[in-house]
């Protein structure tokens, strides 16, 4: 089973994808971890690296190619990244979108990265604008189009343990006999 988890920074992707993978006995791959490793290799913050990526499209393409290869060649995995749902094409069994109010996301990021909330919020908004622009330019993806996802959740409504219960219940309720089909991924062009 391939499950993708996508959403904006601070939406709980990493925490909940790791918890879901653990609960289901699946592997977990985080695009955010890969991106942060790439930033650290260049001695940059994720925000600086995002801005650098605007000038060097190969950075996004390298990351996205790796994630696409993982999504299309592996099973028994929870793949988590901003574009995981899109990059998995039709290979994903479930595509989830996580979100939360920007104030909540900024608080989470501030706590994780040990920085002031107002700084985390400003950086998050810059990062999101940067990513939205690049995804449209590179692949013709409208990151705000949630129609490809099987379910979208506001993660601010549950704590992580309870939210994983919600996700597992969603997966358990799935009945292949009543499945009328996944939302297709159309109109995008992957140029890695």
Swiss-Prot record:
Catalysed reaction(s) here are: CMP + ATP = CDP + ADP; dCMP + ATP = dCDP + ADP
EC main class here is transferase
Q: Where does ATP bind?
A: 7-15
Could you state a single Gene Ontology molecular function term?
dCMP kinase activity
Q: Which Pfam families match?
A: Cytidylate_kin2
- GO biological process annotations for this chain's record? pyrimidine nucleotide metabolic process
Q: Note the superkingdom of the native organism.
A: Archaea
Q: Which GO terms describe its cellular component?
A: cytoplasm
Q: Keywords in UniProt for this one?
A: ATP-binding, Cytoplasm, Kinase, Nucleotide-binding, Transferase
What SUPFAM superfamilies has UniProt attached to this entry? P-loop containing nucleoside triphosphate hydrolases (SSF52540)
InterPro entries to which the protein is assigned, alphabetical:
Cyt_kin_arch (IPR011892), Cytidylate_kinase_dom (IPR011994), P-loop_NTPase (IPR027417)
The keyword Membrane is annotated on this UniProt entry: no
Its subcellular locations are: Cytoplasm
Report the EC code(s) recorded for this entry.
2.7.4.25
Give the family per the record.
Belongs to the cytidylate kinase family. Type 2 subfamily.
Please report the name of this protein according to its UniProt entry: Cytidylate kinase
């Amino acid at each position: 089973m391939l499950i993708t988890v996508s959403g904006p920074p601070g939406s709980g992707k990493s925490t909940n994808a790791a918890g879901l993978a653990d609960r289901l006995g699946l592997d977990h791959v985080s695009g955010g971890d890969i991106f942060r490793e790439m930033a650290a290799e260049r001695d940059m913050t994720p925000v600086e690296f995002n801005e650098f990526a605007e000038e060097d499209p190969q950075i996004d393409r390298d990351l996205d190619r790796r994630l696409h290869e993982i999504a299309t060649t592996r099973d028994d995995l929870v793949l988590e990244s901003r574009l995981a749902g899109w990059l998995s094409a039709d290979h994903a069994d479930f595509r989830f979108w996580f979100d939360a109010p920007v104030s909540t996301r900024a608080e989470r990021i501030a706590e994780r990265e040990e920085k002031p909330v107002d700084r985390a919020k400003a950086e998050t908004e810059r990062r999101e604008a940067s990513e939205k622009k690049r995804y449209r330019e590179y692949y013709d993806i409208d990151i705000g189009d949630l129609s490809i996802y099987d379910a979208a959740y506001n993660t601010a409504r549950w704590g992580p343990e309870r939210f994983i219960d919600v996700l597992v219940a969603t997966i358990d309720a799935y009945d292949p006999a009543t499945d009328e089909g996944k939302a297709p991924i159309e109109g995008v062009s992957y140029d890695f």
